């Protein structure tokens, strides 16, 4: 049974678009006093063709409906009927008018139709309409719309396809993101160290002296034993030369990244022809020089710098040493051989520098900046001396170090004071004099090597190089025998 919304409320539909509230009030006011006229308009403020009129007296409303229904108003036939509440019956599936937001005459009209079609219920005006309290068929539409979400809602709540799809996609996205992040992070890790290393190595290489053209060995790596060995002079019966001391050298090199391996020092050993020291010392110097920066040059590199002169083996020696010690001034300690090399080896003394290599290297550990006495010598010779000038300098060194005698007692290269070397009579002569008051050296200081004073020459089995010669800070004396005179020269090796 249809329920009226408001007894005095009428729905007027089919109005002309040009009809306004004043016209409606003038026409319907004849039937009785009107409390409200509501013309439904669109957003552009144009009439949508229907309106609601409320009479103060319900009887007047009934009379107006009977009188005005089906009549023409402004050229169009209008429909007037009692406004009714919209029905909630599911059977009535009439499509409400597009204007469902506000109370609309079409709503009441359709409601009336619904009532004729057998619809049983109406929505209360409070529920179905806005402020005006009139009916609107739109409520049914809104209700149907509500049903649609209700139907869809359960599927979504129950985890329908859309949620499922979205969830996997999210998971996939997260997985892909994680995957991409993982590789990216790995890439970052892999590429971090090499550049640094590259920069560090390049820095080291740059700091290396220009004398050595990129012969530096691996950074922080000691040259392989084979590498140093390859350069060792062929032994002619001096089998023991480096063998005995090589171990020490190697140990010392192990202790410090900067120390060369024993073999490396070995490589610089002179070829035992009597002039081995020359090349040997020289190459040593260069090597230690290059090594001054954790980069160590191959023995070959140092070797290339060795002067080939046979007669002045010692000179070249000291000279090369100096350079080497210079290079080592940076963190590199001259190998024991390095310092040793500066001593003039005698032809007969196979052990010549080989024995000393280990000691020199140990001494090099004690102090980083001072290479063998050769550093001072090498510097003086390399920078200031050439040809015969070497001899002079070496002779001067001889006074401090003493000339290397041929077969006599071997000269000890140790000595707290480099000036203690006075006896240099035989140069290549028959007896070796102790170069320094200290044959055995102890390295206490980077700058200064503490040694025990040994005035006596070391036994043939072992000759200990003067750590001061190897690392002496204040002066280096190289003994060189040339023409029967011993020459000594003081060099300041503590420049670094």
Swiss-Prot record:
Single GO MF annotation: RNA binding
RRM domain boundaries: 8-85
Known partners and oligomeric status: Interacts with splicing factor proteins SFRS3/SRP20, TRA2B/SFRS10, KHDRBS1/SAM68 and KHDRBS3.
Tissues expressing the protein: Testis-specific.
Positions with biased composition (Basic and acidic residues): 204-214, 242-253, 276-289, 313-326, 335-348, 484-496
Stated name of the protein: RNA-binding motif protein, Y chromosome, family 1 member E
One GO biological process term: positive regulation of mRNA splicing, via spliceosome
Function of the molecule: RNA-binding protein which may be involved in spermatogenesis. Required for sperm development, possibly by participating in pre-mRNA splicing in the testis.
Misc remark: The RBMY1 proteins are encoded by repeated regions of the Y chromosome, mostly within the AZFb region. The exact number of functional copies is unclear and may vary between individuals, and some of them may represent pseudogenes. The proteins are very similar, which makes the characterization of each protein difficult. Thus, most experiments do not discriminate between the different members. One can therefore suppose that reported interactions with a RBMY1 protein involve all the proteins.
Superkingdom to which the source organism belongs: Eukaryota
Low complexity bias: start-end ranges: 97-114, 149-159
Biased composition regions of type Polar residues, renumbered to the chain: 175-184
Cellular compartments per GO CC: nucleolus; nucleoplasm; spliceosomal complex
UniProt-annotated location(s): Nucleus
Keyword entries, A-Z: mRNA processing, mRNA splicing, Nucleus, RNA-binding
Region (Disordered): 67-348, 453-496
């Amino acid at each position: 049974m249809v329920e009226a919304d408001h007894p005095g409320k009428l729905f007027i539909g089919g109005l002309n678009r040009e009809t306004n509230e004043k016209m409606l009030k003038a026409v319907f006011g004849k039937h009785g006093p009107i409390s409200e006229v509501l013309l439904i308009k669109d957003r552009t403020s144009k009439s949508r063709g229907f309106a609601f009129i409320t009479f103060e007296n319900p009887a007047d409303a009934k009379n107006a409906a009977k009188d005005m229904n089906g009549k023409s108003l402004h050229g169009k036939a209008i429909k007037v009927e009692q406004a009714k509440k919209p029905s909630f019956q599911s059977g009535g599936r009439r499509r409400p008018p597009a204007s469902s937001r506000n109370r609309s005459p079409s709503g009441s009209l359709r409601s009336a139709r619904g009532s004729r079609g057998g619809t049983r219920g109406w929505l209360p005006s409070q529920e179905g309409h806005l402020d005006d309290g009139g009916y609107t068929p739109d409520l049914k539409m809104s209700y149907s719309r509500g049903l649609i979400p209700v139907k869809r809602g359960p599927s979504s709540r129950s985890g329908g396809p859309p949620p499922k799809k979205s969830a996997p996609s999210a998971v996939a996205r997260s997985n892909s993101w994680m995957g991409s992040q993982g590789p990216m992070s790995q890439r970052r890790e892999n590429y971090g160290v090499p550049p640094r290393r590259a920069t560090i190595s390049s820095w080291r290489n740059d700091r290396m002296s220009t004398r050595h053209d990129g012969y530096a060995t691996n950074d922080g790596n000691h040259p392989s034993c084979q590498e140093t060995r390859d350069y060792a002079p062929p032994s002619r019966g001096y089998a023991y030369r480096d063998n005995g001391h090589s171990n020490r050298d190697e140990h010392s090199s192990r202790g410090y990244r900067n120390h060369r391996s024993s073999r490396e020092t070995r490589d610089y050993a002179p070829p035992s022809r009597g002039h081995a020291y020359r090349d040997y010392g020289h190459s040593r110097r260069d090597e230690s020089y290059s090594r001054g920066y954790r980069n160590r040059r191959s023995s070959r590199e140092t070797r290339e710098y060795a002067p080939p002169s046979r007669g002045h083996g010692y000179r070249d020696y000291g000279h090369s040493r100096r350079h080497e010690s210079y290079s080592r001034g940076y963190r590199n300690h001259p190998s024991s051989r390095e310092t040793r090399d500066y001593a003039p080896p005698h032809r007969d003394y196979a052990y010549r520098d080989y024995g000393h290599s280990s000691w020199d290297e140990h001494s090099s550990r004690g102090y980083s900046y001072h290479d063998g006495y050769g550093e001072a010598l090498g510097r003086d010779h390399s920078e200031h001396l050439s040809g015969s000038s070497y001899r002079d300098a070496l002779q001067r060194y001889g006074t401090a170090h003493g000339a290397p005698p041929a077969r006599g007692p071997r000269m000890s290269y140790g000595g707290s004071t480099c000036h203690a070397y006075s006896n240099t009579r035989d140069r290549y002569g028959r007896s070796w004099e102790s170069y320094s008051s200290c044959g055995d050296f102890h390295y206490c200081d980077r700058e200064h090597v503490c040694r025990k004073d040994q005035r006596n020459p070391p036994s043939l089995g072992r000759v200990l190089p003067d750590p001061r010669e190897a690392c002496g800070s204040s002066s280096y004396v190289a003994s060189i025998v040339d023409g029967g005179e011993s020459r000594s020269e003081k060099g300041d090796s503590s420049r670094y």
